[in-house]
Design a protein with these regions (language model features):
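Extreme N-terminal starter segment of soluble prokaryotic enzymes
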Residues: 1-4
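Flexible beta->alpha loop and helix N-cap segments adjacent to enzyme active/binding sites
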Residues: 7-35, 82-94, 101-107, 111-219, ...
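Active-site pocket-shaping loop/turn-to-helix segments
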Residues: 29-39, 251-254, 258
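Phosphate/pyrophosphate-binding loops at sites that engage ATP/ADP/AMP, CoA/4′-phosphopantetheine
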Residues: 43-58, 267-276
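Short beta-strand-loop/turn "lid" adjacent to the catalytic site in phosphate-handling enzymes
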Residues: 51-89, 107-108
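Short glycine-rich phosphate-binding loop at a beta-alpha junction
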Residues: 54-67, 276-285, 386
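Active-site cores of enzymes that catalyze phosphoryl transfer or operate on phosphate-rich substrates
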Residues: 202-258
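Phosphate/ATP-binding catalytic cores across multiple sugar-kinase/actin-like superfamilies
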Residues: 254-278
Length: 549
């Protein structure tokens, strides 16, 4: 059984779910090379899969009822599938479903996990849900829907059921964050460069969080989803402060981060105390705040694991809506994941695809047959190496298939990569990819973080061994790696450990101020335009370097 899910508006994309397993998930930004573009996910499906046979797709799902659905006449590629979809939508013969925004987030969080029972929490800026959450066929209207930004669900077996859906008029965290990022710090807050909230989080880690947090707390409580009076007043008050000096900007950022943590804990605690879950599943754009997720282990010591799905922001609505249809509506059994659901859902590129891309640069590059062992050796010689293989990662994080890798033992590597490759601020941290079985030896908490969603404290006695992946406050947003997660990457880190005694490599996304590279040609373009030393196509064992002029 194949179900097609799609997301339109921003974070545009589509997915195909086969027998409950996502087999492909692609986002528009990876192909047009601009972050957070507006568009139509169904049109993207037809453009990317022009030969798709709609008769082979059992059901369609749309996880954003607040988007204008309407007819697809002017938006979908070929006439035949376009006409079929218009007929499906108008007649809705049991094949087309419109799932609530947070309902889709919750489904993605729970059904992507291995838990039979969990408390599900979704947090974002805002999203449209239907008042009757069992209504999965009608479009959202003013009368049948409302906007929420913080919801709680009970997940058990094949079902998720709402416990509480808090209207955004009472609380919203995501919307003020977007406004503060732009208005106070002058950073990008959307298309074409993406939301730079991660930069603000990095700043917050070296600021004084006690100075300003109460004003920002009040703006989150004001809700409303847009530029509320509290939010705009804070912009007017704190922009001049942030402009004074770098440290002042850090202090303002720290206030925003602390306010986020205080209000999130305040809202979550009654539900966690009441239900006392062993497992929490989370989704929604705000849970990309990995600092908050990491602190939840301190707040709630009885919780064994906090699971954040690979695509928690709105790009994951395509996956979540399809999962909801497959499990909760059609009553198909859960999927047992080997350790974790795979985030490597992008297209697989052939040897011909790679050679064709390389041929365009044949006068500028040298190509040699290589091996993983050779690449590990190059890492230990302090080279910066980009890797490309398998399907690209879904989500915001590169997890070994579209990554830039470095030796974490180098005290200079962080500044080198920030300045010469990523072209970003000096204080931005880099993530450690660590063998799952080694986490307990390096961090104070021994938990899973397969999609780089959790910030933890390094153990004092070992952090000096890997200075390139230790943030200024002694933390890291780690990626835990098992052999089932990514066999090639796991074995590569193992080889690095065998040579150095360190089961960790520095991992950052293979890009330079653009979306993560998707195609072989994107990879070569990025490689040629930066100070990356080598590009390694690990499936073919091809090592690329630039010809010396």
């Amino acid at each position: 059984m194949i179900i097609a899910g799609f997301q339109s508006g921003h974070d545009v994309g589509y997915c195909l779910l086969k027998d409950g397993v996502p087999i492909i998930h692609e986002e528009l930004e990876r192909f047009i090379r601009e972050k957070e573009p507006l568009g139509d996910g169904l049109d993207m499906l037809f453009q990317r899969l022009p030969d798709v046979d709609l008769e082979n797709i059992s059901h369609f799902s749309y996880g954003n009822p607040g988007g204008m659905l309407g007819k697809w006449a002017d938006r979908c590629g070929k006439k035949e599938p376009r006409d079929k979809m218009n007929k499906l939508i108008s007649q809705n013969d049991g094949k087309f479903f419109i799932i609530g925004h947070h309902q889709s987030h919750a489904a993605n969080a729970f059904f992507s996990s291995n838990y039979d029972e969990a408390l599900i929490i979704t947090i974002d800026g805002s999203g449209t849900d239907k008042k009757d959450w069992n209504d999965v066929t009608s479009e959202a209207t003013i009368d049948n829907s409302f906007s929420t930004a913080f919801t709680f669900w009970k997940g058990k077996g094949l079902d998720i059921e709402p416990i509480e859906r808090i209207p955004m008029q009472k609380i919203t965290i995501g919307s003020p964050w977007r406004i503060y990022t732009r208005e106070i710090f002058g950073l990008s807050s959307g298309h074409p460069y993406g939301l730079a909230a991660g930069t603000v989080m990095a700043m917050a880690s070296v600021g004084d969080s006690e100075k300003y947090w109460k004003d920002f707390y009040n703006s989150f409580k004001a809700g409303g989803g847009g530029p509320s009076s509290h939010t705009m007043e804070n912009c007017r008050k704190y922009k001049p402060i942030a402009d004074k000096s770098e440290q002042d900007a850090f202090d303002v950022a720290a206030g925003i981060q602390k306010a986020t943590e205080v209000i999130a804990k305040e809202i979550m605690s009654p539900y966690i105390e009441k239900y006392n879950p062993k497992h929490i599943c989370m989704s929604g754009g705000v849970v990309l705040n990995s600092v908050m997720v990491g602190k939840m282990y301190d707040w709630y010591p009885n919780v064994e694991q906090i699971y954040v799905c690979p695509v928690p922001y709105d790009g994951g609505l395509a996956i979540g809506s399809a999962q909801y249809v497959y499990h909760q509506i059609l009553r198909n059994p859960r999927v047992e994941w080997k350790d974790n659901t795979s985030p490597y859902l992008g297209n697989l590129y052939t040897e011909d695809d790679i050679n064709s891309a390389l041929s365009k640069y044949e006068n500028k590059i040298e190509i040699t047959d290589s091996s993983d062992e050779d690449v590990v050796e190059l890492l230990t010689e302090q080279n910066i190496i980009s890797v490309f293989g398998g399907g690209s990662e879904s989500g915001r994080r590169a997890l070994g298939n579209r990554s830039i890798l470095c030796d974490p033992r180098s005290p200079d590597m962080k500044s080198i990569v920030n300045e010469k490759v990523k072209h970003r601020q000096w204080f931005r941290p880099f993530a450690p990819s660590i063998l799952r079985e080694s986490v307990k030896d390096w961090f104070y908490k021994d938990v899973d973080s397969p999609y780089m969603t959790t910030v933890l404290d390094w153990k004092e006695e070992v952090k000096d061994k890997v200075p390139a992946v230790v943030h200024l406050n002694g933390t890291a947003r780690l990626q835990t790696v098992t052999e089932n997660d990514n066999k090639w990457y796991y074995n590569f880190i193992k080889r690095f450990e065998d040579k150095t005694g360190v089961p960790i490599v520095l991992n950052t996304s293979f890009n330079d101020r653009e979306p993560i590279v998707e195609t072989p040609e994107h990879a070569i373009n990025c490689f040629m335009g930066t100070n990356i030393d080598y590009l390694y196509f690990y499936d073919l064992k091809l090592l690329i370097c630039k010809k010396k002029v």
